[in-house]
Swiss-Prot record:
InterPro entries: Beta-lactam-related, Beta-lactam/transpept-like, Beta-lactamase-like_AB/R
Entry keyword set: Glycoprotein, Secreted, Signal
Similarity field: Belongs to the beta-lactamase family.
Organism: Dictyostelium discoideum (Social amoeba)
Name by which UniProt lists this protein: Beta-lactamase-like protein 3
Record lineage: Eukaryota, Amoebozoa, Evosea, Eumycetozoa, Dictyostelia
Length: 552
């Protein structure tokens, strides 16, 4: 290809991305789950799962979808034991292994203990709480010597992927605390750049859980030998009503267990072996059910979580945001490791998906969130599967467009009502007082339109005044400040249509800024905020974006 053509293509691509608008999402509100579009979508999802199960030769499968605080789709496919034709049908209350999805519970425990002051900071060296842990490093830089909670939870610790034990010894005395710590003390970190490169580590998460347990013992808030398991069980499982979720592979779980299968070399299927995870439980040892996982997802999505500060297990909104925050961008450019989720940008729907997979022999699960729309998905295949996302991405392609359509429709109805109510209110400061041309001595300009400014009709959007800042034509409007009754001279400026703007402009420009109008008394020309006598006041100046501009 001619070099000039290459440059032209690059320039066009750059230009298009420069002006690409920022995707916006409707506010998640209650919608009719019996709407024909939703019923059709749920039927499509059902057909999708059955079609893919058939093509992938999967006998048993579980799918649960939640929206805000309710289950909107939930179905079990196949038998409890697919190899037994007389087996009972699989249910949403049968136990399965969720494997590495356990890491979400361990992460939640870490944030909660930080919030409670049990651990001082996520950037503390874990050896301050667990001095028994030792590992060697070939790096002499003192900055690389410590391993922190944050590094363990974000796969940036430099630890190897797996615990230094044979898998068949998990849960036995051949792979207990003493044995593992002894082996690690003779091994080395594998990463040249801890805290920069991501290297997935089951060992790191198992160690994280054990250190969290030790921190509870150190602060004398717990005496139990298995402090990690005890805390998660009593503070998360019991608080959320996850009655069939446990670390214990006891008789109750065995009797309720859905049978996972693995394919042998000859193509036939065999029952997957199950053994306790033991020391490795924080990285993948939980047994749960679809219904219990729905409760967990609802907890992470529901607005009620932020409102019930008196509940037995409460998360601050800032902590919940940390749980869903990105940490380290991967080399593909659109996937990011977080704590504990892998965040991937779905280009077809212009939305981020936060997901955590769990894979053990015979059990392959995925828990994923489309958080802007408060949708949660838990899908589990009880045999090997060719889909890393366990069919969730295809399900999102069906569901997200429908939810956006219906939520936008509901939002439009609500907006019409709000606009009507706004028109019925008599503002403390009429729009005509604010409209006009503002300028400072450096030539900066701020123009506010109303229906009388230039005689060309009503220049308002949904009752809000239009704004032109420095001749930018940036479709800004003036909105009522939330505390308008107490501070009527304060207003908010924002874009009346955010879909027309780029993400960087929305984040770094005038959007959502507060502006402050200054009034003077007509009689004595002194500043005044006595709005009981509004007819005797006039606007003198406005403070906006760090500028003081005077009304001309």
């Amino acid at each position: 290809m001619n070099t000039n053509y290459k440059y032209i293509i690059i320039l066009i691509f750059t230009f298009l991305n420069l002006f690409k608008t920022c995707p916006t999402y409707p506010k998640p509100i209650k919608i009719d789950q019996n709407h024909p579009l939703l019923l059709k979508a749920y039927n499509e999802i059902d057909n999708l799962i059955q079609t893919k199960m058939k093509s992938d030769n999967i006998s048993s499968f579980i799918a649960t979808i939640v929206y805000k605080d309710e289950i909107i789709f939930s179905k079990a496919y196949g038998k409890i034991n697919p190899l037994d034709e007389n087996s009972l049908n699989l249910t949403l209350n049968n136990n399965i292994r969720i494997a590495s999805i356990t890491k979400t519970f361990t992460s939640l425990m870490m944030f909660k203990l930080r919030d409670q002051g049990i651990i001082n900071s996520l950037d503390d060296d874990i050896r301050d709480y667990f001095p028994q842990f030792k590992i060697n490093s070939i790096y002499k830089d003192k900055r690389n010597e410590k391993i922190t909670f944050r590094q363990l939870a974000s796969h940036q610790s430099g630890l190897a992927r797996e615990t230094p034990c044979d898998r068949i010894d998990y849960g036995t005395n051949k792979c207990n605390d003493k044995v593992i710590l002894s082996k690690l003390s003779k091994q080395f970190l594998i990463s040249k750049q801890p805290n920069i490169l991501s290297h997935y580590s089951n060992l790191g998460f198992s160690l994280l859980g054990r250190v969290l347990g030790e921190s509870l013992k150190m602060k004398k808030t717990m005496k139990e030998q298995q402090a990690y398991e005890y805390w998660v069980t009593n503070n998360i499982f019991k608080s959320l009503g996850m009655d069939n979720t446990t670390f214990n592979y006891d008789e109750k779980v065995k009797d309720n267990m859905a049978i996972g299968l693995y394919k042998k070399s000859n193509g036939s299927f065999s029952i997957a072996p199950i053994s306790p995870a033991g020391w490795n439980s924080p990285g993948g040892g939980i047994f749960s059910t679809a219904n219990d996982m729905a409760k967990f997802m609802i907890f992470l999505l529901s607005d009620e979580n932020q409102q019930q500060s008196e509940s037995s297990f409460y998360l601050e909104e800032t902590t919940l945001n940390e749980l869903f925050s990105p940490m380290n961008l991967l080399r593909d450019g659109f996937s990011v490791y977080g704590i504990p989720f892998l965040h991937t940008y779905d280009t077809s729907n212009s939305i981020w998906i936060s997901a955590k997979n769990g894979d053990l022999t015979g059990y392959h699960s995925n828990m994923a969130f489309v958080r802007p729309l408060k949708l949660g998905f838990f899908f589990s295949s009880l045999s090997d599967i060719n889909s890393p996302d366990i069919y969730i991405n295809s399900t999102i392609d069906i569901l997200v467009p429908i939810y956006e359509i219906l939520l936008n429709e509901e939002a439009s109805k609500i907006q019409q009502i709000e606009n009507y109510l706004i028109k019925q209110e008599i503002p403390i400061i009429p729009n005509s007082f604010l409209a006009g041309f503002y300028k400072d001595f450096h030539g900066n300009e701020f123009l506010i339109y109303n229906e009388t400014f230039n005689g060309n009709g009503d220049h308002t959007i949904n009752g809000n005044l239009l704004v032109n800042f420095d001749n930018s034509n940036s479709n800004l409007t003036i909105h009522t400040f939330e505390l308008d009754k107490d501070y009527p001279y304060i207003k908010r400026i924002s874009y009346y249509d955010e879909t027309l703007q780029g993400c960087r402009l929305l984040a770094g420009g005038e959007n959502e800024e507060l502006i402050y109008f200054n009034f003077i008394n007509n009689d004595n020309q002194q500043e005044s905020t006595n709005f009981n006598d509004i007819k005797n006041l006039k606007v003198y100046s406005v403070q906006v974006m760090g500028l003081l501009l005077y009304k001309i």
